Amino acid sequence: MTKQHAFTREDLLRCSRGELFGPGNAQLPAPNMLMVDRITHISEEGGKFGKGELVAELDINPDLWFFACHFEGDPVMPGCLGLDAMWQLVGFYLGWQGNPGRGRALGSGEVKFFGQVLPTAKKVTYNIQIKRTMRGKLVLAIAEGTVSVDGREIYSAEGLRVGLFTSTENF
């Protein structure tokens, strides 16, 4: 069976309900925490490290939930949501590869914020470069990622780590 290399909003919502990779396997969060509208490219080859890459997008509009509360009179998308989106995508990549288990963010190395997402923006683009995947007691991916708004890079993260666990009871 040929793997799908792009995913629509409806595909991602199916993933949030556990319908894309099967019960007990990688899921994206449901809205409002789902920070991606589409994955435009996903591949196990290529990318900066030759281990795979993802490109995904989030459409921005002034009615998004976080603009009303972060901050009143000075609306800006919380930087942690962009970081979480990158973790979401690394976990999605592991599920897309066919690995079993539920995803958990395990940390990151250096994270830099040098721009912001305002309600006047149109589109956020996430670019994830897979550095390494490991399959042992747990399935683990390490990646680098960037967040861009309307074509301008505004965040970067090194050492994004996500693991898949067949049991999360003792995590």
Curated annotation (Swiss-Prot):
GO terms for molecular function: (3R)-hydroxyacyl-[acyl-carrier-protein] dehydratase activity; trans-2-decenoyl-acyl-carrier-protein isomerase activity. Its main location: cytoplasm. It is found in: Cytoplasm. Pathway: Lipid metabolism; fatty acid biosynthesis. One of its GO terms (biological process) is unsaturated fatty acid biosynthetic process. Pfam families: FabA. InterPro entries: FabA (IPR010083), FabA_FabZ (IPR013114), HotDog_dom_sf (IPR029069). Keywords: Cytoplasm, Fatty acid biosynthesis, Fatty acid metabolism, Isomerase, Lipid biosynthesis, Lipid metabolism, Lyase. It catalyses: a (3R)-hydroxyacyl-[ACP] = a (2E)-enoyl-[ACP] + H2O; (3R)-hydroxydecanoyl-[ACP] = (2E)-decenoyl-[ACP] + H2O; (2E)-decenoyl-[ACP] = (3Z)-decenoyl-[ACP]. Its EC number is 4.2.1.59, 5.3.3.14. GO terms for cellular component: cytoplasm. Necessary for the introduction of cis unsaturation into fatty acids. Catalyzes the dehydration of (3R)-3-hydroxydecanoyl-ACP to E-(2)-decenoyl-ACP and then its isomerization to Z-(3)-decenoyl-ACP. Can catalyze the dehydratase reaction for beta-hydroxyacyl-ACPs with saturated chain lengths up to 16:0, being most active on intermediate chain length. Belongs to the thioester dehydratase family. FabA subfamily. Homodimer. This is 3-hydroxydecanoyl-[acyl-carrier-protein] dehydratase. It comes from Pseudomonas syringae pv. tomato (strain ATCC BAA-871 / DC3000).
